[in-house]
Regions:
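Donor nucleotide-activated moiety binding/catalytic core segment of transferases
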Residues: 114-134
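Alpha-helical substrate-recognition element adjacent to the catalytic core
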Residues: 19-108
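Non-catalytic pre-domain segments flanking phosphatase-related domains
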Residues: 1-26
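A short acidic, amphipathic alpha-helical/loop segment
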Residues: 64-68, 129-131, 144-151
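Acidic, Mg2+-coordinating phosphoryl-transfer loop and its flanking beta/alpha structural elements
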Residues: 135-168
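Structural alpha-beta junctions
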Residues: 75-76, 106-116, 150-153
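Lumenal/extracellular "mature" regions of secretory-pathway glycan-modifying transferases
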Residues: 96-99, 112-119, 154-157
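A structural signal for isolated positions on well-ordered beta-strands in alpha/beta enzyme cores
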Residues: 78-80, 118, 136
């Protein structure tokens, strides 16, 4: 697989335009869901209130994203979530966060059938926690993308629709 950092306006090499049966992963907070736009989000999370995860507004056109993801799955691709839990929390709060994130997905992307959902310890390497770390990852965290790029391709949250449109 060709490894490179994507830049808006560049062409994908032919090998990448013809990918089939790839795995496409998404981070949630700051990528699909605008957690940081929720009023008092940090204070709520520190007090172990998981509601900001459900209250977050979408960061892209989710109708278009759902159409693209459904098309990807019809073409044999698999779709997954790999997202971190909150920092330093109890087991009960971790479970509440998992439930809230899954509710957000069900409410905002109900037509998407997720092949994998991994909601893992904060800071854990995402490339170790999924079935195929040579797939594609969309994540707002540059350090996560840098690690992922050792085997796969990663893109920022700003590029989701453009990249999926070009790959499919």
């Amino acid at each position: 697989m060709i490894k490179y950092n994507y830049r808006k306006g560049t062409e994908f090499p032919n090998e990448e335009r013809n990918f089939r049966k790839m795995r496409i992963y998404f981070d949630m907070d700051g990528t699909l869901a605008d957690l940081y736009g929720v009023e008092n989000w940090l204070e709520k999370l520190r007090s172990e209130d998981s509601s900001p995860y459900e209250e977050a507004e979408p960061m892209c056109d989710l109708r278009l994203l759902a159409r693209l993801l459904n098309k990807a799955q019809k073409n044999g691709n698999e779709i997954g979530i790999i997202s971190w839990l909150s920092k330093e929390a109890t087991a009960e709060y971790d479970e509440a966060v998992r439930i809230s994130k899954k509710r957000w997905l069900a409410n905002h992307l109900p037509s998407v059938v997720w092949n994998e959902i991994h909601i893992i310890k904060y800071g854990a390497p995402k490339h170790f926690n999924c079935q195929d770390n040579s797939g594609i990852l969309f994540d707002d965290n540059e350090d996560v993308r840098r690690l992922w790029n050792k085997r796969g391709m990663s893109f920022s949250e700003e590029d989701i629709i453009e990249v999926l449109s070009r790959l499919l």
